[in-house]
Swiss-Prot record:
GO term, biological process aspect, one: endocytosis involved in viral entry into host cell
Biased composition (Basic residues): 485-494
Taxonomic placement: Viruses, Monodnaviria, Shotokuvirae, Cossaviricota, Papovaviricetes
The protein's name in its UniProt record: Major capsid protein L1
Keywords: Capsid protein, Disulfide bond, Host nucleus, Host-virus interaction, Late protein, T=7 icosahedral capsid protein, Viral attachment to host cell, Viral penetration into host cytoplasm, Virion, Virus endocytosis by host, Virus entry into host cell
One matching Pfam family: Late_protein_L1
Residue ranges, annotated region (Disordered): 475-494
Disulfide bond keyword on record: yes
InterPro entries per the UniProt record, alphabetical: Capsid_L1_Papillomavir (IPR002210), Capsid_L1_sf_Papillomavir (IPR036973), dsDNA_vir_gr_I_capsid (IPR011222)
Length: 494
């Protein structure tokens, strides 16, 4: 093919065609049949800073994420009110999320944390303070209230978090002992119990804080994650995030300087030396202690309903795997109980700290409620081919498959596969594995807790009122437009 172009110009060809992602509204039919589901009161109790394996006490911190994996019943095995609703030979049923309310109990309380040996050498904001000479161990006890975060995110798959961690160096560029390692931005699914960012950054603190003194106790040897909103927004399907709501606030309460050998010196062209060098041992590695400030009910994201009319991705709330992932981050109720117990059974008559044992506990209280709509998917050749491309596991659950190419190799099938007379048969391939079996979630089973009587539940009544329907048992029906066939005599005046 001959192509003419001006001298020195580049010739650009169009990119290769890609598979277009379709909106679920183009092949998922809404039925206007709604169900309500809710949980019991969900409670969790544990130590706010670390877990105690000897007594099987978990770590339950107000600065942790709570990720609920909500299991829904299979609508294709559901007892439907109308048998003519769909044809099982040509259609399959799915759930779509329409409403959600995450309710939280317990009073508001600022989250307080700290470290009994925090890496703070000296006060860096008070210019008149007398500086002490650096020693081998300048750590001090420090407590603080941390960055305040409220976050609610719902999707069909786990939310994606981001954090900074050590990177693999290039070949031949291995850092020497004591050098700063290369770092990179990493991603991982947000699991139940992962730590939020509380004002120190989203980092892998097991690698970044090897002196165990740079961050509060509940961050030691753990990762603090921040939801990767950019990556989830770029996902065309949007399965990991149908929608989210968040509220963050933080300010710096105090500024300190860190202790340690500073190997990255200030360039000489950035400062002038003092005539009397009295600050040769000062540290320029500054850090600020965060504070979330006032906690009030004015800015609460919880205990209120959310309605999903249009998701941020092309999956408009369809739960293909009959499950939902609700990710919650809320440290506005991060109060810690202090429990004092005498060392013996006698009632103390005067205060003596040596005769009292002190314990810490943190408690959390949740309740979830959802509004689901029943939807149908017609099993056309185009729809099956598209689902085979974007979500083949759905067709496997529906027992709908694309015919594989004819086998060219004769395979062997043994009878009595558990017999010792034959070779070992691999049984793991036949068993269906959970794709999230290595992740930790708070499993919630709603497979037997759905109800069509929406007016019997608070969220259901709000949904009915949102659509202009009263809570009366009698449903309003549209007026009949059929003309009357009764012949009436016409009155004539004489």
């Amino acid at each position: 093919m001959a192509v003419w172009q001006q001298q020195g110009q580049r010739l650009y060809f169009p990119p290769n065609p890609v598979t277009k992602v379709l909106c679920t509204e183009s092949y998922v039919k809404r039925t206007s049949i709604f169900y309500h589901g809710e949980t019991e009161r969900l409670l969790t109790v544990g130590h706010p800073y670390w877990k105690i394996p000897e007594q099987n006490i978990p770590k339950v911190s107000g600065n942790q994420y709570r990720v609920f994996r909500v299991q829904l019943p299979d609508p294709n095995q559901f007892a439907l009110p109308d048998k003519n609703l769909h044809n099982p030979a040509k259609e399959r049923l799915v759930w779509a999320i329409l409403g959600l309310q995450v309710s939280r109990g317990q009073p508001l309380g600022a989250p307080v944390t700290g470290n009994q040996l925090f890496n703070v050498w000296t006060d860096a904001e008070n210019v008149t303070a007398k500086r002490a000479l650096p020693g081998s161990d300048d750590r001090k006890q420090l407590g603080m209230d941390v960055k305040q975060t409220q976050m609610l995110l719902i999707g069909q798959s786990p939310a994606i978090g981001e954090y900074w961690g050590k990177a693999i160096p290039c070949e031949g560029k291995q850092p020497k002992a004591g050098d700063c390692p290369p770092i990179e931005l990493k991603n991982k699914p947000i699991e139940d119990g992962d730590m939020m960012d509380i004002g120190f950054g989203a980092c892998d603190w097991k690698d970044f804080s090897q002196n165990l003194s740079d961050v509060p106790l509940d961050l030691i040897n753990s990762k603090s994650l921040y939801p990767d909103y950019l990556k989830m927004a770029e996902d065309s399907l949007g399965n990991s995030c149908f929608f989210y709501a968040r509220r963050e606030q933080v300010y710096v309460r105090h500024v300190y300087s860190r202790g340690g050998e500073q190997k990255e010196a200030i360039p000489k062209d950035m400062t002038l030396p003092q005539q009397v060098p009295d600050n040769k041992d000062t540290s320029f590695t500054f850090m600020g202690t965060p504070s979330g400030s006032l906690v009030s009910t004015d800015g609460q994201l919880f205990n209120r309903p959310y309605w999903l009319y249009q998701a941020q991705g092309l999956n408009n709330g369809v739960c293909w795997d009959n499950e939902l992932f609700i990710t919650v981050g809320d440290n506005s109720r991060g109060g810690v109980f202090t429990i004092s117990v005498p060392v013996d059974d006698r009632k103390p008559e005067q205060y003596n700290s040596a005769n009292m044992n002190i314990y810490c506990r943190h408690v959390e209280e949740y309740k979830l409620a959802v509004i689901l709509e029943l939807c149908s998917v017609e099993l056309t050749s185009e729809t099956v081919a598209y689902l085979q491309t974007v979500n083949p596991s759905v067709l496997e659950k529906w027992e709908v498959g694309v015919n594989p190419p004819p086998a060219t190799v004769l395979e062997d099938t043994y009878r009595y596969q558990e017999s010792k007379a034959i070779k070992c048969i691999d049984q793991t391939a036949a068993a269906k594995k959970d794709k999230y079996e290595n992740l930790s979630f708070w499993n919630i089973d709603l497979r037997e807790k759905l109800s069509a009587d929406l007016d019997q539940y608070p969220l259901g009544r709000r949904f009915l009122a949102q659509n202009g329907i009263t809570c009366s048992r009698k449903r309003l029906r549209p007026a009949s437009t059929k003309k009357s066939t009764t012949n009436k005599k016409r009155k004539t005046s004489r």
